């Protein structure tokens, strides 16, 4: 063999040796793939500059590069090295990838990118667990096309360590785009740049939000942080600005600026809608625009005392009374109170046709409104019911119970909401001495349309956040000590009182409900503040007036409307509206918007109470059909129908068998009802008792409706008091209403006698 033939034999031997090494690598890779997890080729681990960043600190990357490496449109489906999509990953690999993605987005430190240098690989830390990085040899790079394993840094075992190329003593960095599976790099067209601009912009926005907040959040949804109690949003002089309460200001300017920066332009928030709404009138510029955002605190009680009455929401519309008693009767004797029959609506239901509509229906007692009230004989039954209910962790007083509703061929299981009431939640005063001294009516406002989950402490926090320091909060309850949706709030300062009166309405937004709470001045029975001689009939809540008026003075001051402002009169109740010191004081009233007709009033926003005490007879005058006539906001254009007969519905109408079998108070015979068609003026003058006994000054659980005073019918356009009839409508500001008290009446028996006799009819014209 000559020396010229030796160079010819070396390539053949090298080729055979390379072929053996390739077969050996294929066999080893096959065995390795069976024991190790399959790694997507697109997540290629490239060599990291260890001297620059360290072995345990790979070069920082961006989310954009990581996303782009998962999308390779230049690889065809028939290619051997086709990318494995995200849907081909196992569950563990998906979870690991998502964790690494979060680490890259949250803990990323941006570095300066050198022009002309490719972006480092984004998945080096992820694949470092599975495949060790190996440097490919020069011979493999020049003589062979890279296999699928060479993409992960794998090379022939017999490649000498000294033959690996070095650039300045440092390993050469490569990226997945530069490798491109051994193909030549193609220049990206202008279309590719246009398509990637949107993705790049979204990625940069995502990284900004993540870096600011510390956790991944959606891009198009602005983060809304809630304080421990809430925040208030009210309009200012400029329609494009809003101001927040002290609670919302505590978050600082950083939160406000970030919230404005990352709010989507396509998302119209409630605040923007309220700002863009034009004012309804100059006098009502601040009304119906304040909103409180917050969360109800979790309730925690020690040995609570529950009301025997509970709210049951979400019941089927065709459920029967028998089905309800069958579901709740296992906890104790109970009765059903249907919507519209409770105390706060009973006074206004003078139309007998609407009352008999339920009895004429196919389903006797159908709950068309979707809720009912259950009244138990013993409060311990309520505690037993709550033990069988499910409750959300950290809930604010909502419970859930499953009832059975019988269908034609099957039995339906329906989950309903239970809202109990703890009697101690009806009052909240920071200073207990106020219960003995009494509240100041000149700093007290009336609130109506309260939600059933709003306790006195919750209302105290809301009003204090919105308007100022609150002294005491009292909620009105019925004879079962269940709230009727109204209450009174006493402020410490007059400034907070006037601010609440000027606001008029307050929107309460929580994760559980949204409610529009009404705020009115707490009125007293007093004389007109203009003439100081006549009794006041109405109250003007406009800040320029803010005084009591009689009929004559109101017509003189507001007859022409020279100032161009809106002056809405609020009807003054009777003399019983004076503040009473004690926990049993109840107002039992609410008011409604003047623009809202009575036919469209929802039962949840029309709270008018009529508390009937079984121990005393009730004097009832002509009841008003319009609920807004009972307290404020009666316009001159509204028509009133005066009926000559009083309509009274008992709390429940059980069958005679039920009345015999049960003996608790709500099934006792209804009290005696008297109708007096004589016009009455307030305050009333009672006839002194024959035996000199004291006349009862008030009854905490009763009220009465009275006809208009005779002085009102002094024009030809109005009817006289002698020709009142159901067929003849008349214009009327509103009915005189006893504000939770009975008129003064004398009884034949003394105060110590157990038997009650019929009262003498007092002469109200004295």
From Swiss-Prot:
The keyword RNA-binding applies. One of its GO terms (cellular component) is synapse. It holds the Pfam family CEBP_ZZ. GO terms for biological process: negative regulation of cytoplasmic translation. GO terms for molecular function: mRNA 3'-UTR binding; mRNA regulatory element binding translation repressor activity; ribosome binding; translation factor activity, RNA binding. SUPFAM superfamilies: RNA-binding domain, RBD. Residues 589-602 have a biased composition (Low complexity). InterPro entries: CEBP_ZZ (IPR032296), CEBP_ZZ_sf (IPR038446), CPEB (IPR034819), CPEB1_RRM1 (IPR034977), Nucleotide-bd_a/b_plait_sf (IPR012677), RBD_domain_sf (IPR035979), RRM_dom (IPR000504). It comes from the Eukaryota. The keyword RNA-binding applies. Keywords: RNA-binding. Residues 233-256, 276-289 have a biased composition (Polar residues). Residues 310-332 form the RRM domain. Residues 1-35, 131-179, 216-299, 578-602 are annotated as: Disordered. PANTHER family: CYTOPLASMIC POLYADENYLATION ELEMENT BINDING PROTEIN CPEB (PTHR12566), CYTOPLASMIC POLYADENYLATION ELEMENT-BINDING PROTEIN 1 (PTHR12566:SF9). Cytoplasmic polyadenylation element binding protein that binds to and regulates the translation of specific mRNAs. This is Cytoplasmic polyadenylation element-binding protein 3. The lineage of its organism: Eukaryota, Metazoa, Ecdysozoa, Nematoda, Chromadorea.
């Amino acid at each position: 063999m000559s020396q010229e033939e030796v160079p010819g034999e070396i390539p053949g031997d090298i080729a055979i040796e390379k072929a053996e090494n390739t077969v050996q690598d294929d066999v080893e890779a096959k065995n390795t793939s069976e024991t190790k997890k399959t790694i997507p080729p697109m997540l290629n681990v490239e060599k990291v500059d260890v001297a620059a960043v360290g072995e345990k600190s790979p070069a920082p990357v961006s989310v954009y590069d990581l996303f782009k490496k998962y999308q390779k449109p230049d690889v065809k489906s028939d290619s051997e090295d086709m990318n494995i999509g995200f849907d081909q990953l196992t569950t563990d690999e998906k979870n690991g990838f998502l964790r690494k993605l979060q680490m890259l987005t949250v803990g990323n430190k941006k570095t300066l990118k050198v022009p002309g240098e490719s972006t480092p690989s984004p998945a080096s830390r992820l694949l470092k667990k599975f495949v060790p990085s190996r440097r490919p040899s020069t011979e493999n790079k020049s003589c062979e096309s890279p296999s699928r394993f060479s993409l992960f840094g794998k090379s022939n075992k017999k490649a000498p360590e000294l033959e690996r190329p070095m650039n300045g003593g440092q390993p050469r960095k490569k990226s997945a785009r530069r490798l491109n599976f051994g193909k030549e790099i193609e220049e990206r067209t202008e279309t590719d740049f246009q398509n990637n601009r949107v993705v790049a912009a979204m990625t940069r926005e995502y990284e900004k939000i993540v870096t600011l907040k510390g956790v991944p959040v959606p891009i198009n949804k602005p983060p809304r942080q809630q304080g421990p109690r809430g925040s208030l949003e009210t309009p200012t002089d400029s329609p494009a600005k809003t101001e927040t309460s002290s609670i919302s200001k505590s978050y600082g300017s950083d939160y406000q600026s970030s919230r404005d920066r990352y709010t989507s332009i396509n998302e119209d928030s409630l605040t923007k809608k309220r700002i863009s709404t034009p004012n309804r009138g100059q006098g009502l510029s601040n009304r119906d625009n304040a909103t409180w955002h917050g969360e109800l605190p979790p309730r925690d009680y020690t040995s609570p005392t529950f009301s025997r009455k509970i709210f049951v929401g979400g019941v089927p519309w065709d459920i029967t009374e028998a089905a309800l008693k069958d579901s709740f009767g296992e906890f104790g004797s109970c009765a059903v109170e249907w919507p519209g029959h409770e105390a706060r609506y009973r006074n206004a239901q003078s139309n007998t046709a609407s009352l008999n509509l339920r009895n004429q229906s196919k389903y006797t007692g159908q709950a068309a409104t979707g809720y009912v009230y259950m009244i138990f004989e013993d409060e311990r039954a309520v505690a037993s019911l709550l033990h069988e209910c499910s409750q959300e962790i950290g809930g604010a007083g909502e419970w859930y119970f499953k009832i059975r509703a019988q269908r034609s061929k099957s039995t339906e299981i329906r989950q309903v909401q239970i809202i109990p009431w703890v009697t101690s939640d009806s009052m909240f005063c920071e200073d207990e001495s106020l219960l003995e001294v009494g509240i100041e009516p000149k700093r007290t406002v009336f609130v109506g349309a309260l939600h059933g989950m709003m306790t006195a402490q919750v209302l105290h926090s809301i009003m204090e956040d919105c308007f100022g320091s609150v002294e005491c909060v009292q909620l009105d309850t019925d004879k079962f000590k269940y709230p009727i949706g109204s209450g009174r709030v006493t402020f410490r300062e007059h400034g907070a009182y006037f601010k609440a009166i000027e606001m008029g309405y307050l929107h309460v937004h929580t994760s559980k409900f949204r409610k529009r709470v009404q705020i009115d001045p707490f009125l007293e029975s007093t004389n007109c503040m203009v003439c100081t001689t006549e009794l006041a009939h109405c109250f003007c809540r406009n800040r320029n007036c803010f005084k009591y008026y009689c009929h004559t003075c109101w017509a003189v001051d507001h007859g022409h409307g020279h100032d161009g402002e809106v002056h809405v009169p609020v009807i003054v109740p009777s003399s019983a509206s004076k503040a009473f010191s004690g926990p049993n004081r109840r107002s039992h009233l609410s008011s409604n918007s003047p623009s809202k007709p009575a036919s469209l009033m929802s039962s949840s926003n029309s709270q008018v109470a009529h508390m009937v005490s079984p121990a005393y007879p009730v004097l009832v005058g002509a009841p008003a059909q319009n609920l807004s006539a009972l307290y404020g906001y009666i316009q001159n254009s509204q028509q009133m129908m005066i009926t000559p007969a009083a309509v009274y519905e008992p709390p429940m109408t059980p069958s005679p068998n039920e009345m015999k079998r049960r003996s608790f108070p709500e099934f006792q015979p209804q009290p005696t009802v008297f109708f007096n068609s004589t016009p009455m003026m307030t305050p009333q003058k009672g006839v002194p008792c024959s035996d000199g006994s004291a006349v009862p000054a008030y009854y905490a659980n009763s009220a009465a409706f009275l006809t208009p005073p005779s002085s009102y019918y002094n024009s030809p356009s109005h009817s006289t008091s002698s020709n009142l009839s159901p067929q003849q409508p008349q214009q009327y500001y509103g009915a005189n209403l006893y504000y939770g008290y009975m008129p003064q009446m004398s009884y034949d028996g003394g105060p110590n006698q157990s038997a009650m006799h019929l009262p003498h009819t007092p002469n109200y014209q004295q």
